[in-house]
């Protein structure tokens, strides 16, 4: 079993560069199946989710070359076949293969997706969209087959999303890119990652308009070609390092940051009194003085991102006073709370809300990462704490934070990954 060991209490200083967006690349790689030529991605993060997606593409017959942060994928050999269930079941974003395989072959046979356990994340919206486009759904054991009649080309449709969903919006875009006719998505999600996927599709020859707004229109085309695409910076990784820098830094510059992707998050930091300077593509976070408590309520983009409430929680514990966190997106995103309490935090879950009272001096302790962003919170807490913190279940952390051990070590952290 692998663990992360942190000897905390050291102030961090220096520069850290944000990697490409995890939540983009896990959709971009399946999207490439739609291409009739080679596609190159630049800025690909070194995370286990990418490793798993590469393996899936290769098992299906595609060719992949990797050189550092550059990924070259030739999807022309990809076969119409059942997906490798083991990798699919461990990876929530595997559901993006539904849309891309439907668009290419008129059917997809896949295992049900896995990932972090954050409460209900039904794929009903995805399936409703596919059915509106002429597909039928069949359950076969632990797998699901989504298919048009006799593998015919999927049809364009007018689709209204009952709730705002990033995954369903992207999946519908993927299926619609090569559909017969026009697809309109109303009440679409607006996240930057959706714009990134639409940009790749358009560079491949698709006709997607309105990405980043509530209405997206896709005119289906018969074929897509190869291209080269730069993955956008990871706004969640950026926010995680910004919060970490405010909590335990004495001057840290976070590079490769797009401020416009983080406005609601940065507004909360400013309300706390966090001192920072926004540059063209970077944010410099100073060493902090006294901080004020704030209340946080997550909401779909451009609101406060659910993926940032856990990484920000340790910073909130430095504020003088009481505050609360309400996650309206994922109801079970509270599993970091008992772990922080084990480290001495005055924090608890009351009536579905996280209530904290600070400031708190944390102490090192053995803790367990229950999901990706909870793991990021525990890393920050370990850096803040007096003494040694041992984090287990770290595979979640490695799923989403590229080279996190090396990046923190370069800032002066006493952190290491060990095999037990």
From Swiss-Prot:
Alphabetized Gene3D superfamilies for the sequence: Enolpyruvate transferase domain
Alphabetical keyword list: Cell cycle, Cell division, Cell shape, Cell wall biogenesis/degradation, Cytoplasm, Peptidoglycan synthesis, Pyruvate, Transferase
Catalytic activity: phosphoenolpyruvate + UDP-N-acetyl-alpha-D-glucosamine = UDP-N-acetyl-3-O-(1-carboxyvinyl)-alpha-D-glucosamine + phosphate
Modification type 2-(S-cysteinyl)pyruvic acid O-phosphothioketal: residues: 116
InterPro entries recorded: Enolpyruvate_Tfrase_dom, Enolpyruvate_Tfrase_sf, MurA_subfamily, RNA3'P_cycl/enolpyr_Trfase_a/b, UDP_GlcNAc_COvinyl_MurA
Enzyme class: transferase
One Pfam family, short name: EPSP_synthase
Annotated binding of UDP-N-acetyl-alpha-D-glucosamine, by residue: 92, 121-125, 307, 329
Family statement: Belongs to the EPSP synthase family. MurA subfamily.
Summary of the function given for this chain in its UniProt record: Cell wall formation. Adds enolpyruvyl to UDP-N-acetylglucosamine.
UniProt protein name: UDP-N-acetylglucosamine 1-carboxyvinyltransferase 2
Name of the gene: murA2
């Amino acid at each position: 079993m692998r663990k992360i060991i942190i000897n905390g209490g050291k102030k961090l200083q220096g520069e850290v560069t944000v990697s490409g967006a995890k939540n983009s690349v896990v959709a971009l790689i399946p999207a490439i199946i739609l291409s009739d030529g080679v596609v190159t991605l630049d800025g690909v993060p070194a995370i286990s989710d990418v490793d798993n997606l590469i393996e899936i593409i290769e098992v299906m017959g595609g060719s992949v070359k990797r050189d550092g942060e550059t990924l070259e994928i030739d999807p022309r050999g990809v076969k119409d076949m059942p997906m490798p269930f083991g990798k699919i079941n461990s990876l929530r974003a595997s559901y993006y293969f539904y849309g891309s395989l439907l668009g290419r072959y008129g059917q997809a046979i896949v295992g049900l997706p896995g990932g972090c356990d954050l409460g209900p994340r039904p794929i009903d919206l995805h399936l409703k969209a596919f059915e509106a486009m002429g597909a039928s759904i069949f359950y076969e054991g632990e797998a699901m087959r989504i298919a048009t009649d006799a593998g015919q080309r999927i049809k364009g449709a007018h689709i209204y999303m009952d709730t705002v969903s990033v995954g369903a919006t992207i999946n519908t875009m993927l299926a619609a890119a090569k559909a017969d006719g026009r697809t309109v998505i109303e009440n679409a999600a607006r996240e930057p990652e959706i714009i990134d996927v639409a940009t790749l599709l358009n560079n491949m020859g698709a006709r997607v308009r309105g990405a980043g707004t509530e209405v997206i229109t896709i005119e289906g085309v018969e074929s897509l070609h190869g291209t080269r695409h730069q993955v956008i910076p990871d706004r969640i990784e950026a926010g995680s390092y910004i919060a970490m820098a405010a909590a335990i830094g004495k001057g840290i510059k976070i590079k490769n940051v797009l401020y416009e992707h983080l406005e609601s998050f940065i507004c909360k930091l400013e309300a706390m009194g966090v001192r920072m300077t926004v540059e063209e593509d970077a944010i410099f976070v100073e060493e902090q003085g006294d901080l004020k408590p704030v209340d946080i309520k997550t909401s779909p983009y451009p609101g406060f991102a659910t993926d940032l409430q856990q990484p920000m929680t340790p910073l909130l514990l430095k504020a003088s006073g009481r505050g609360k966190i309400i996650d309206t997106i994922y109801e079970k995103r509270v599993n970091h709370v008992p772990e922080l309490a084990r480290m001495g935090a005055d924090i608890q879950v009351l009536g579905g809300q996280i209530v904290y009272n600070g400031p708190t001096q944390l102490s090192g302790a053995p803790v367990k990462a229950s999901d990706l962003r909870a793991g990021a919170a525990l890393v920050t807490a370990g850096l803040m704490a007096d003494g040694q913190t041992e984090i287990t279940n770290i595979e979640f952390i490695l799923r989403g934070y590229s080279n996190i051990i090396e990046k923190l070590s370069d800032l002066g952290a006493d952190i290491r990954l060990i095999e037990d």
